[in-house]
A protein has these predicted regions:
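Structural alpha/beta core scaffold segments of enzyme domains
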Residues: 1-256
Length: 256
């Protein structure tokens, strides 16, 4: 669950498996197995007993999210993205009124290439080889995880197997690689998520619901249109400074 964390793990058996170098805690919400090969690491991780704290969002499910969206559509107040003329009167005076509700679900970016990065950390410098859509954002994330100033960190942008925004807005995978490398100074660490990890721990396209009410004249021409949107903001998480008067222009422009 989002907001969950790591309680504990028992690596007494796993660290003795072939190829395993270390079993490490990574931040507050992940465990990594460092091994000679990726398959050895995955096999060991699958066998590792882990206790998770599922956090405050454990009760959140599809039904509760749907209820929040409906509540937003029915709320008395809302931020106004665009208003031209008196739409309420235009619809009230229409010969015919058409209403429709549309829904866009959460969707995983599902890039062809799962999240990955390679990192090498020393007390003097941190280097990261990272498939990224935003080198500046990647550098900021790497510097934060490395505990070093940005001018002592290098991010090498490499070819990526699909991005779709997932590798531009968030660099949690690069941060994880650095946090692992920081516990093994001087050792290059290649982090590669499994497809299952990539699907479960993605940052999804926001869920949105829109209610549209249109007024038509006797000839079927549109005389008024009112659109109400309820959903998760894109910019509030990615770049809140771009929000204007409570309006997420990415969501608003996508609707238009």
């Amino acid at each position: 669950t989002f907001g969950g964390g790591l309680k504990s793990f028992d690596d007494s058996r796993v660290r003795k498996l072939p190829g395993v170098r270390k079993v490490l805690r990574v931040g507050e919400d992940a465990v990594a197995v460092v091994a000679e090969t990726w398959w050895q690491a995955k096999t060991a991780l699958d066998a590792l007993p882990i206790v998770w704290d599922r956090g405050d969002n454990v009760q959140v499910d599809s039904a509760s999210i749907e209820a929040m969206l409906d509540e937003g559509l029915s709320a008395k107040e809302a931020f106004v993205g665009n208003q031209v003329g008196d739409v309420k009167r235009a619809i009230a005076d229409a010969d015919r009124i058409v209403e429709a509700t549309y829904r866009y679900p959460f969707q995983n970016h599902a890039t062809m290439e799962p999240m990955n990065a390679t990192a090498r950390w020393t007390e003097e410098r941190c280097e990261v080889w990272c498939p990224t859509q935003n080198g500046e954002a990647a550098l900021q994330a790497v510097a934060k995880a490395a505990g070093l100033p940005a001018n002592r960190c290098e991010v090498y942008k490499i070819h990526l197997g699909g991005g779709f925004g997932r590798r531009g807005a968030f660099h949690d995978f690069a941060e994880q690689a650095v946090r692992i490398a920081k516990q093994m100074p001087g050792t290059p660490i290649k982090l590669l998520w499994t497809r299952e990890e990539d699907m479960l721990h993605g940052h999804y396209h926001p869920i949105t619901k829109a209610r549209m009410v249109g007024g038509l004249d006797a000839a079927g021409r549109l005389t008024g249109l009112h659109i109400r949107i309820s959903g998760q903001s894109i910019l509030a998480a990615v770049n809140p400074a771009w929000m204007r008067n409570g309006v997420d222009m990415f969501t608003f422009q996508g609707l238009l």
